[in-house]
C-alpha cells in the first residue's frame, strides 16, 4: 500500500523555499577502536540508533538553521517510519508529502566508526526506498504540482534513492525554473554515470566529492589543480555551478563559469565524520536561500560541517544558529 502521509501539525498552506527529494534511513552506529578484519568478531565501545539517510540529513541541516524546507521520501508504515516523520518535524522539516509503503520496512544503514581515525564504513539496506519510483511520485503529487509549487527556490537531490526518480525530479524542477542541486553521493556505479551525464544540463549546481567528480569526468581529482580541471569539464557537460568537496582540504568551486577558487578546510579534532558532507550541502543551500552567493554560502557551510565532525552522531551533530561562530549568518 502506498499513500501520502498528511501530518496534522502543519495547518494551512506551507510554501517552502527548499525541497529535498531523497532518502530517510535509520542509522545503527557502532563505535570501535579499529575496523574488523575478515572473520573477526569484536565488541563496540558504544552504540546508538539514530536518524540518517542523505536526503533527510540535508533537510535537517537546513531545518535546524531555520530554513523553510520540506522533505519528500519513502518510509515504511512501521513504527520506524512514524518515528522518522516526527523527528523531521522536530527539526523544522515539513513532512506533508512524505510517502509510506506497507511493502517493506523503513530503510536502514549499518555504520562502524573508528574512534581513533574518525573514519567510517557504511552498509545501506534501502528497504522502502526501493519503492520510491518516479511513477509513484508523479501519481502521488499530481505530476509534481503539489511539491514543485510556484515560489519554490531550491531542489536538493542525492544518489541514494532510485536514480530515475532523482533525474525525473531534477528535470521537472528545472523546467519550472527551480534552482536544482544534485549531490551525487553515494558514488554512482558506471551504468549510473552514463545515465547522469545527459541530465547534467538540468542541474544548476552539481556538488560531488573528489571521487564522484572523477567518476563523472574521467579525471582523477587529487589536488586543487585537478579539482579545477574537473570543474571545467563538468561545466562543459552543461552544469552552471560546481562545488567539489575535498574533505579536510575544504572545497573548490566555480559559479556561473567563473574561474574556479579553492577554500581550505577548517582544522578541528574530528570525532565522527558521518554525515558531514550532508551537513555541508544542506547548510550551503540554506545560506543561499538567505541571499548569500555560492562562495559565501559554502564558507558558512564549511563552518557548520566542521562543528558536526566534533560530535558523535549524524543529524544530532548538526548545529543550530546559536552554536555558530560570530558572523556566520
From Swiss-Prot:
GO molecular function per UniProt: ATP binding; metal ion binding; ribokinase activity
Name-wise, this protein is: Ribokinase
Give me any GO biological process, just one: D-ribose catabolic process
The UniProt annotation places substrate binding at 25-27, 53-57, 160, 278
Keyword Metal-binding among record annotations: yes
Entry's Gene Ontology cellular component terms: glycosome; nucleus
Q: Which cofactor(s) does the record list?
A: Mg(2+)
Catalysed reactions, as listed in the record: D-ribose + ATP = D-ribose 5-phosphate + ADP + H(+)
Q: List ligand-binding residues for ATP.
A: 209, 245-250, 277-278, 302
The subunit structure is:
Homodimer.
Residue numbers annotated as active site: 278
